[in-house]
């Protein structure tokens, strides 16, 4: 049986059966629900609301901003927190203009410093010079979000490197008390975000030691979750350990999820990387992936990254590999020391939103004729039409169903297969879910054919779209630094790298890129030495590369400019394995 109609009339669903496609253009949602059986686990109302947000912002801001760190140790002085022009309304305006529909704020990061005047600790803004200790950043941001029509959410680090009781039962009650403050006092919260980094070295009230915990059992997640659902019944929970939350990490902070992305997970057991990145087709609970990344290399502000803001083409690539792969995008905007989003970040974020609008402003399928037969949908443009993007959406209220599909364009009277150009292997035409966007080289065709090849049950396709995205220019190289050339590297031991160059010169920083294909050998703690003669060595710096395992980006060690001809880079601690590894190293010369 064949139906031909104006695509503009196809507003609700294409209900596909293996041998027959029925166009449901007049059924109400109630009557549809009466006729369609769910397929496996389905989303809750909270998860549906979350999925429809599509993009929202992370805001990282704490004492780390003033110590040029990603992870504070827990002994940083609250007197450092004194921004000259903190403006949460500017944050909210920028995020809204960048297309974000909400903001998640780091109310407390691993250092333990609270960005609200918590009644349970002195380590907070109430003991900073900002507003004479009377300020509350969480309050100001929550109010600003509601003024701008944005949703508000909180990040609360379970790990606290400041608290003396961390690792002991007393800390869990402290943690819940602080969570209760945030959930009770700042209006409706759309998401509660618990970081997966838990346990390690820290100040811990002066003990200055390493404490290990079992992240799955220590915090008593079941009881914590019950409290959240009681105090904030509309919130979703993101949790990277212990009991499953409503959302899952996608296994990387690079800003992408798998081209195959099931919103399903097993409710029990460990979650290896492939489960996080691709989901689990036969999972017994609905747990969609949230894709988190930063507009800069790091999560917190560093002035050395002002010229390293993600390019527009990189942001669009991130969009296609997150929102366009059945996920939501959580995009971080770090706050600069003055208390505002840096202009480089705000301008790029706003340009990002404008580009998304430009790509999707005209759905070429709306003026075409659509013919549906069996498991095929043919969109007939009536004349050669240029396009390079395809969009499909399932009605996930009834489960995620499509496993594999095919796209073909009619070019010069012949069907030509299309593939997703953003995947390295295969054609990338697998799952759909809430939204799937396929990118391919620009083609001029008279027709487009969409064929479902495999599905768990009858697919419910609620939207199809065809678009022409403008071409983006190549990325502009980063500027502002001179990197030394002619470096000579060798290893004097499995944990010591020696670097020298042709002539003595002034150096001001050293950059280390972790291995990109494995965590083995990644340096997490280091000591750096300089010399002019191989005999007398001056210690330049020692410290920690925070979060380097999850976010293996360039790590910069800055120091006072010094004359040197060689460096010694010691791996004091390695993530896994017993031999240090690297992707690249750079020595920055001059007095930068």
Place the predicted regions along the sequence by residue:
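Noncatalytic modules at the cell exterior or secretory-pathway interfaces
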Residues: 441-453, 560-572
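Surface-exposed loop/edge segments in extracytoplasmic proteins
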Residues: 413-420, 474, 534-542
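Extended extracellular/luminal ectodomain segments enriched in beta-structured repeat modules
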Residues: 383-389, 445-446, 502-509, 563-566
């Amino acid at each position: 049986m064949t139906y031909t109609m104006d695509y503009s009339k196809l507003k609700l669903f294409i209900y596909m059966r293996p041998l027959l496609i029925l166009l449901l253009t007049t059924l109400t949602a109630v009557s549809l629900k009466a006729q369609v059986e769910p397929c496996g686990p389905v989303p809750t109302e909270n998860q549906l609301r979350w999925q429809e947000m599509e993009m929202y912002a992370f805001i990282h801001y704490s004492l780390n901003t003033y110590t040029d760190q990603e992870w504070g140790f827990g002994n940083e002085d609250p007197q450092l927190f004194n921004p000259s022009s903190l403006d949460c309304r500017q944050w909210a305006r920028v995020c809204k203009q960048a297309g974000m529909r909400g903001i998640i704020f780091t109310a407390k990061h691993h250092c333990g410093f609270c960005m609200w005047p918590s009644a349970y600790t002195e380590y907070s803004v109430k003991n900073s010079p900002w507003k004479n200790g009377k300020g509350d950043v969480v309050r100001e941001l929550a109010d600003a979000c509601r003024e701008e029509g944005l949703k508000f959410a909180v990040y609360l680090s379970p790990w606290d490197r400041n608290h003396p009781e961390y690792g002991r039962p007393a800390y869990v009650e402290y943690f819940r008390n602080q969570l209760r403050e945030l959930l009770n006092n700042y209006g409706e919260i759309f998401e509660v975000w618990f970081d997966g980094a838990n346990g390690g070295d820290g100040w811990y009230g002066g003990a200055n030691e390493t404490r290990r915990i079992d992240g799955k059992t220590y915090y008593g997640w079941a009881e914590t979750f019950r409290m959240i659902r009681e105090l904030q019944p509309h919130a979703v929970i993101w949790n990277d350990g212990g009991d499953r939350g409503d959302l899952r990490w996608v296994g990387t902070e690079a800003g992408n999820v798998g081209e195959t992305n099931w919103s399903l997970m097993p409710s029990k057991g460990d979650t290896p990387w492939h489960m996080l990145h691709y989901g689990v087709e036969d999972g017994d609970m609905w747990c969609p992936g949230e894709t988190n990344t930063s507009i800069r290399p790091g999560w917190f502000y560093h002035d050395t990254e002002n010229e390293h803001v993600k390019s527009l083409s990189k942001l669009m690539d991130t969009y296609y590999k997150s929102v366009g792969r059945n996920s939501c995008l959580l995009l971080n905007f770090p706050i600069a020391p003055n208390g505002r989003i840096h202009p480089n970040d705000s301008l790029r974020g706003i340009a990002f939103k404008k580009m998304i609008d430009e790509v999707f402003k005209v759905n070429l399928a709306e003026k075409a004729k659509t013919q549906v037969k069996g498991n095929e949908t043919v969109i007939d443009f009536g004349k050669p039409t240029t396009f390079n993007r395809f969009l499909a959406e399932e009605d996930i209220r009834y489960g995620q169903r499509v496993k594999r599909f095919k796209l073909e364009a009619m070019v010069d009277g012949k069907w030509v297969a299309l593939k997703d150009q953003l995947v390295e292997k295969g054609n990338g035409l697998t799952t759909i879910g809430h939204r799937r966007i396929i990118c391919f080289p620009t083609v001029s065709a008279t027709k487009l054919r969409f064929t479902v090849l495999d599905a768990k049950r009858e697919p419910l396709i609620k939207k199809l779209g065809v678009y022409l995205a403008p071409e983006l220019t190549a990325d502009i190289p980063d500027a502002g630094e001179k990197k030394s050339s002619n470096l000579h590297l060798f290893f004097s031991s499995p944990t010591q790298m020696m670097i020298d160059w042709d002539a003595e010169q002034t150096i001001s920083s050293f950059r280390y890129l972790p291995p990109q294909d494995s965590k083995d050998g990644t340096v997490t703690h280091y000591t750096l030495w300089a010399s002019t003669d191989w005999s007398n060595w001056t210690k330049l710096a020692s410290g920690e590369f925070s979060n380097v395992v999850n976010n293996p980006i360039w790590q910069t060690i800055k120091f006072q400019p010094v004359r040197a001809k060689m460096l010694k880079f010691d791996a004091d601690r390695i993530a896994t394995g017993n031999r240090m590894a690297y992707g690249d190293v750079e020595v920055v010369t001059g007095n930068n």
